[in-house]
Design a protein with these regions (language model features):
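Non-catalytic cap/lid and distal C-terminal segments of serine-dependent acyl enzymes
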Residues: 1-261
Length: 261
């Protein structure tokens, strides 16, 4: 694998930004790379996935690019006053930039997003708010009950109002409800496939159960896993290995894995 440290200017953020990018050793001419956007948690940065997991080793088996952006402590939110627009940056500007820098596939069916904790929230928000852009999303120990998060993290009230926090797309349970309802009225809408995993001893476990039950009751395509574990890298290291196997990716043996296998 090749690891690129990229620095570039973001017009949306109005500042320099960074992303780590993993690419296969060999690129096939005329065959752009499927891409996984892998998001970090509240206290992390763009380097954390490579430093704390065996991501590069796991990725060696797949024809895939992995983009790990820095979103600081943004919660992947667009602020009410417009001063910061991290959701717009992650879901719209970043893919366009990466697709101009690297030979990445631009089709929805080849674009995926995943993340841990705050990043798990960001991943599901991207998929549920912009289903036309992502084929699949995965959340590991995600902050999936945004009402609860808003009540417990005072920082969030400095970025968005209580009204914004309670409704889609910020509130992803509300976003899931609206997308499910819309898909019943407009069957041609493609809903991303979702993968969710959380440790049974994680402080976010109850929030994850709430999202799971709501998503399944709405008929969303969600694969849910739980196992003993807390909010730590030992748990997430296994999550990312399993997620790479779950995504519909071309392997070194030239066999495409199927979502859900």
């Amino acid at each position: 694998m090749a690891l690129f440290h990229s620095c570039f200017f973001s017009d949306v953020l109005g500042m320099q930004s960074r992303a780590e990018v993993i690419l296969p050793d060999r690129l096939e001419e005329g065959r752009p790379l499927p891409t996984l956007y892998l998001l970090h948690g509240l206290s992390d940065d763009e380097t954390i996935w490579c430093r704390h997991t065996s991501l590069e080793l796991y990725a060696r088996g797949y024809y895939l690019a992995i983009v790990m952006p820095n979103a600081h402590r943004s919660f992947y939110l667009d602020s009410d006053d417009g001063s910061t627009r991290y959701f717009t940056y992650i879901s719209e500007e970043l893919p366009k930039l990466m697709e101009s820098f690297f030979p990445l596939a631009k089709e929805r069916e080849h674009r995926f997003v995943a993340g841990l904790s705050m990043g798990g929230y960001g991943a599901f928000k991207c998929a549920l708010a912009k289903p036309e852009r992502y084929a699949a999303a995965a959340s590991f120990s995600g902050v999936l009950d945004f009402d609860h998060a808003y009540r417990n993290w005072e920082y969030l009230s400095t970025v968005i109002s209580e009204e914004t926090a309670a409704t889609a797309p910020t509130n992803i349970i509300d976003a899931a409800n609206k997308l499910a309802a819309l898909s019943k009225l407009t069957p041609e809408i493609k809903i991303p496939k979702l993968y969710q995993e959380c440790g049974t001893e994680d402080f976010l476990y109850e929030s994850n159960i709430k999202f799971r039950d709501n998503a399944l009751s709405n008929g969303l395509s969600l694969e849910y896993h739980e196992r003993p574990g807390t909010h730590n890298w030992e748990f997430w290291n296994e999550c990312i290995r399993k997620t790479l196997a779950w995504l519909p990716l071309q392997t070194e043996s030239n066999k495409t894995t199927a979502i859900g296998v």
